[in-house]
């Protein structure tokens, strides 16, 4: 991940949203691209995932992501790297499979900003929603009266 532009901030945002998802009992599935040659996901992030799909294709759906998804959850939130390669190809496949796909722009990255920007433009044009970690957290909570509001707020702030 060190080759990804702004990788420390991206990892921080990925950890924020996965911690929030865990608090709210939202399933978390990770993917790892060719870990035998590229290495594993950050251990702190991997520990928050209920499962991790190991993949060699850039599109995680080809290596079993769709089969791993809960059947009762048509809305998906995607984060990760690289925006214009793995994340984009996976999101396009999920959109074609009629999932409601949102991309957390502050929790995605590429080696170059230009690639990330054009990957996000392509995803928006294909029907993906572009959101931020904070937007999704508050959307999940719906109200300051949510029983987990203070716990989530501690992560957001």
Predicted regions span which residues?
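Residue-level marker of alpha-helix boundaries and capping positions
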Residues: 8, 32, 81, 110-111
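A short glycine-rich beta-strand->turn/loop micro-motif centered on a GG-aromatic cluster
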Residues: 77-80, 100-113
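Short gly/pro/ser/thr-enriched loop/turn and capping motifs at secondary-structure boundaries
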Residues: 59-61, 85, 108-113, 138
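Short, ordered loop/turn segments at secondary-structure junctions
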Residues: 33-34, 106-109, 135
């Amino acid at each position: 991940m060190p080759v990804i532009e702004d990788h420390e901030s991206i990892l921080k945002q990925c950890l924020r949203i996965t911690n929030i998802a865990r608090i709210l009992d939202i399933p978390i599935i990770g993917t790892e691209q060719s870990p035998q040659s590229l290495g594993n996901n950050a251990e702190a992030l991997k520990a928050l995932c209920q499962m991790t799909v190991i993949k060699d294709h850039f599109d995680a759906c080809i290596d079993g992501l769709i089969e791993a998804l809960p059947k009762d959850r048509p809305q998906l939130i995607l984060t990760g790297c690289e925006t214009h390669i793995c994340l984009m190809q996976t999101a396009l496949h999920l959109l074609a499979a009629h999932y409601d796909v949102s991309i957390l722009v502050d929790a995605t990255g590429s080696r170059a900003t230009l690639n990330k920007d054009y990957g996000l433009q392509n995803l928006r044009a294909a029907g993906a929603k572009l959101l931020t970690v904070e937007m999704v957290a508050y959307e999940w909570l719906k109200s300051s009266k949510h029983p987990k509001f203070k716990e989530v707020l501690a992560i957001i702030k």
